[in-house]
Amino acid sequence: MTVLANHSFAKMNGIGNEIVIVDLRNTDSQLSAAEARAIAAPGGVPYDQLMVLQKPRMPGTTAFVRIYNNDGSEAGACGNGMRCVAKRVFGESGAQAATFETRAGLLNCWQGPSPDLYTVDMGTPKFGWQDIPLAEEFRDTRYIELQIGPIDAPVLHSPSVVSMGNPHAIFWVDDIEAYDLERLGPLLENHPIFPERANITLAHVVDRNHIRMRTWERGAGLTLACGSAACATAVAAARLKRTDRTVEMSLPGGDLTIEWRESDDHVLMTGAAVLEYEGLFDPDLFAALA
């Protein structure tokens, strides 16, 4: 029987990004992709990302955090999920700062400017075509040659691409609501140019300090919020000189403040995290896996 049967969990959200947190730091158990899918299945606990806390592997870190999408695939980064992890850990320990290890590297988190806000240092963005990664070489990733629709009248074209520990493509549009992202998102996510698939964002620059955006999240689908996409979009806009290095990002689920810090190129994300409820996993969710 899986260790998850009757195991506790916390259902949270980061400005609408649905997060489930499972703490396995007191065991040596590993969570499988099949178990991650079972949790999100009908009758389970719906989520966009599942944050699994494991024993720390490096001195000075609080936990190794594995991040799953609801299709069972693993993600390197999830900014909204890390804010939820920070809220959970800080509430239990009384700490106001912690360092977590993820597949994307070390992430520092701390209490934000008010009790309901948390800041995550998402590290440095990457722009090289091999780092994102892309299937072919592009010397300048501020825009790449990619379009969907007729050649003479493409529906979307020329995205900016950025890695924030996971691949992002940002399409600049005048109206983020004018496109059927549920139809276009999976086509672009799985485009051959993205060998590891990609998160797809539609973004509109309102002014130098404000961007509106919607995201189709790799492995999760249309989402109310994607923190790493907000970071990637803010960085991409600043690279194009369309915004300053600190911007307010308006997502369907709420707002984030993103700062691309000039001193070290780290990207800082500040936003809310909310606990919805706690519970125990129903063993029947995992019966088919026995």
From Swiss-Prot:
Entry annotation: catalytic residues: C78, C226
Catalytic activity: (2S,6S)-2,6-diaminopimelate = meso-2,6-diaminopimelate
Alphabetical list of PROSITE patterns matching this protein: DAP_EPIMERASE
Localisation per UniProt entry: Cytoplasm
E.C. designation(s): 5.1.1.7
GO cellular component: cytosol
Keywords, comma-separated and alphabetical: Amino-acid biosynthesis, Cytoplasm, Isomerase, Lysine biosynthesis
Organism domain of life: Bacteria
The name this protein goes by in its record: Diaminopimelate epimerase
Organism: Afipia carboxidovorans (strain ATCC 49405 / DSM 1227 / KCTC 32145 / OM5) (Oligotropha carboxidovorans)
Protein encoded by which gene: dapF
